[in-house]
Regions:
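Conserved acidic
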Residues: 24-509
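Gly/Thr-rich phosphate-binding beta-strand-loop-beta motif of the actin/hexokinase/Hsp70
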Residues: 1-22, 196-199
Length: 509
């Protein structure tokens, strides 16, 4: 393993390597030849966007734009493949190439170390993974580290699913449940979360190749998976059935709207008397065998998180479990799909998470105390005590304390950092300017390739002062009879809501 750093020195690009070699040149062919020569073992840097910045600075604006748009450009005999925030690959040919990965993603709390210490940190990861038989081919991300293992599972993909069903479920992607029910400041809140929510659902998914998928006007009794299209009508204070308007904005409304429901969703409506559904047609999977191809692997990775591993390796386990879900909806820049795309699995995971939350609220009569829902957790008003579990898919208390809720996407609580602002910072901002409706703080961020195209090419790879912040909004995803007009009002009053009416929304898609 070798670690690298880069900079501009006397108008030349200087690359330093932990093997005590290096180069300083203004000739790109020489530079790339040096980098391509570093093929043996892993090549790592602290931050790949910082590492690549000196190279980007000497490219033409057209070359930078081409690289930004396609992720790939050719310069002389060499090809550059740059996956922003992930990896850099320099090649002369497919086999004659060198890749560079960043490890800051696994050491998020650490300051940038020395070149030698970067190498040590990388070796810690590789050594610990090797002890449990994991020998990654690349370090692009947590999921990439486990790619060989996931590839060996031979999972069902979109190619095994009727095209029309793929269209139905692909259209439902990105509907995680994020909703604020009350706005204001709350002195004591309890945050309940599901341990590894998405992975717990993923572990129990069936391989639909073992059975038949039928399209009909009725649902077969023997069906285990159902994707029912029809007219949904709900009137509850909350609903797990998320709706997207023509602009892709998400709502959980009451009233009638078109929807696609799973079998679990249909059962939820019936068990909790939560609404009605007029069936138009459905795709149903009738199994001949109930096989869970991810069950063993997901449970094994989850259990390894509690082992005697360093913090970065535990972060890799967690990232791999959560990240594999994204592969089921993976689409590349050129429109091609990832090899593990499976939109019915993606749909069942998101849908299952929403229904787990809704069922927990119903079973524990928590409706009146819901403050916010955020994908796999519930923020409740008050000091709640439950028996926290460490098992995958079960509930735990994540944290307790005060919260400030500005909107569905802006909930300041504990160590959460919406808009790059912590709870205590948000409170200080509003207390200093209680009559304001917008607040900002000073911060720094890295100037990236996208910024270069906006005239910031000279600052590429450097830190630039910015002003992240938040503001009161007056267009919410729920109906608020009254809204705070100033920060002071937000701190001193509670603003309850009701579900927005589906009839007021634009046609769903």
């Amino acid at each position: 393993m070798k670690s690298f750093s880069s900079c501009i020195l006397n108008s030349k690009i200087e690359i330093r390597c932990s093997d005590r070699t290096g180069i300083a040149t203004d000739n790109l062919d020489e530079l790339f030849a040096y980098l391509v020569s570093k093929q043996e073992g892993f090549n790592i840097c602290w931050d790949v966007d910082v590492f690549v910045a000196p190279i980007l600075k000497v490219l033409s604006i057209q070359q930078v734009e081409d690289l930004f748009n396609s992720g790939r450009i050719s310069i002389g005999k060499h090809t550059i493949i740059y996956n922003q925030g992930k990896s850099l690959r320099i090649s002369l040919s497919y086999k004659n190439a060198a890749s560079f990965y960043w490890i800051k993603q696994y050491y998020q709390e650490d300051e940038e170390p020395s070149l030698d210490d970067i190498k040590v940190k990388g070796e810690i990861i590789i050594t610990e993974l090797a002890k449990i038989g994991i020998n990654p081919k690349k370090l692009t991300s947590s999921v990439a580290i486990f790619e060989n293992i996931f590839d060996q599972l031979n999972l069902p993909t979109y190619k095994d699913i009727p095209v029309e069903l793929c269209k139905w479920t692909w259209g439902q992607k990105g509907r995680a449940w994020t909703e604020a029910f009350k706005l204001g400041h709350f002195d004591m809140c309890t945050d309940l979360d599901i341990n590894s929510c998405f992975p717990s659902i993923m572990a129990d998914l069936y391989d639909t190749r073992y059975g038949t998928i039928v399209h009909s006007k009725e649902i077969p009794e023997a069906a285990d998976y159902v994707f029912a299209r029809g007219m949904l009508d709900t009137s509850d204070y909350f609903t797990p059935f998320v709706y997207a308007n023509e602009y892709g904005h998400l709502f959980s409304p009451r009233g009638k709207r078109e929807a696609i429901l799973s079998k679990q969703g249909l059962d939820y409506l019936k068990e909790y008397d939560a609404g009605t559904f007029e069936l138009q047609d459905a795709f149903s999977w009738v199994p001949t065998r109930k096989f869970k191809p991810m069950h063993y692997t997901v449970n094994k990775i989850f259990n390894q998180r509690s082992g005697n591993f360093s913090r970065p390796v535990k972060r890799i386990f967690k990232g791999a479990l959560n990240g594999i879900y994204g592969r089921f909806y993976q689409e590349f820049r050129d429109g091609t799909l990832g090899k593990q795309v499976n939109p019915i699995w993606g749909f069942l995971i998101e849908d299952g998470a929403r229904l787990k939350i809704a069922e927990y609220i119903k079973n524990n009569h928590l409706e009146k105390d819901i403050l916010a829902i955020n994908t796999d957790g519930i923020l409740l008003e008050g000091d709640y005590n439950i028996e926290s579990s460490t098992k995958m898919g079960e509930w735990r208390i994540d944290n307790k304390g005060p919260a400030l809720i500005v909107s569905s996407g802006t909930v300041f609580f504990a160590d959460k950092k919406p808009c790059q602002v912590y709870y205590h910072e948000a409170m200080d901002m509003i207390r200093c300017y209680p009559e304001a409706v917008e607040w900002h703080k000073k911060a720094e961020r890295l100037i990236t390739i996208g910024d270069a195209l906006q005239g910031w090419s000279e600052e590429l790879g450097s830190l630039h002062e910015t002003s992240p912040g938040f503001s009161l909004i007056f267009d919410h995803d729920r109906y608020y009879p009254s809204l705070p007009q100033t920060g002071g009002e937000l701190l001193n009053r509670i603003f309850p809501s009701q579900p927005i009416d589906a009839s007021s929304l634009v046609t769903a898609k």
